[in-house]
């Protein structure tokens, strides 16, 4: 799930699951972070277009200008390749089902192209830095191994990869993340960027969480602070 606090209200965006390919993005709100009220219009978003199967999972949201951008993962109609899309709603809206406009009606905003990405780009994790959106993502399906890449966009729709190789790799034999470093989430904490991600050393039987600090060099390239 993805959460954002706006005007003292926590907006939680989560997915239905187990109805594959009919899993969609839902919305709930809370003022205390514990007790949530489901949006009566759920699901609030499902993608359209011949390029995808109609599924949407792995929600992430980021405020950008006067819009809330909702990133999600979907698959092609053959249910083989996983890729990303984006929708937008006015920040002053209630984010219910009628508020969202899909910004990529004809194609994905990021699909697997590099060898290490294999057949999957998923788990979008977006943050705003210096007026641009940086998108961290999981490349390859779970434990294949999944690793973390990064792309950047000036408008939140058209993304350019920053690296041809993973920014955060899986570990070597015997390490805690031998099978995967994946499913990132980026959080800005008073100007510091914290990237949380999962790892496994037994092909997904056991999962662990880790955190890396991300900084940006003079050219706007993100890097892991050692």
Where does each model-flagged region fall?
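Beta-rich carbohydrate-recognition and catalytic domains
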Residues: 2-54, 62-119, 127-177, 188-226
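Catalytic-core region of carbohydrate-active enzymes that cleave or remodel glycosidic bonds
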Residues: 183
């Amino acid at each position: 799930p993805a959460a954002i606090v706006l005007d003292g209200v926590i907006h939680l965006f989560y997915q239905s699951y187990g109805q594959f390919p009919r899993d969609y993005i839902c919305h709930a709100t809370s003022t205390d972070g514990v007790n949530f009220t489901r949006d009566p219009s759920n699901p609030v978003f499902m993608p359209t277009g011949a390029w995808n199967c109609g599924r949407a999972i792995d929600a992430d949201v980021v405020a950008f200008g006067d819009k809330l951008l909702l990133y999600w993962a979907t698959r092609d109609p053959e249910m083989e390749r996983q890729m990303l899309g984006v929708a937008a709603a006015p920040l002053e809206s209630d984010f219910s089902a009628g508020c969202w406009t899909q910004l990529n009606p004809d194609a994905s905003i990021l699909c697997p192209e590099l060898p290490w990405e294999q057949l999957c780009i998923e788990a979008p994790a977006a943050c705003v830095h210096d007026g641009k959106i940086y998108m961290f993502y999981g490349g390859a399906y779970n434990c294949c191994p999944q690793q973390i890449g990064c792309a950047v966009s000036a408008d939140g729709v058209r993304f350019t990869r920053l690296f041809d190789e993973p920014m955060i790799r899986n570990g070597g034999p015997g390490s805690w993340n031998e099978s995967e470093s994946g499913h990132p989430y980026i959080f800005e904490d008073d100007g510091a960027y914290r990237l949380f991600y999962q790892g496994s050393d037994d092909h997904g039987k056991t999962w662990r969480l880790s955190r890396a600090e991300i900084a940006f060099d003079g050219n706007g390239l993100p890097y892991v602070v050692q």
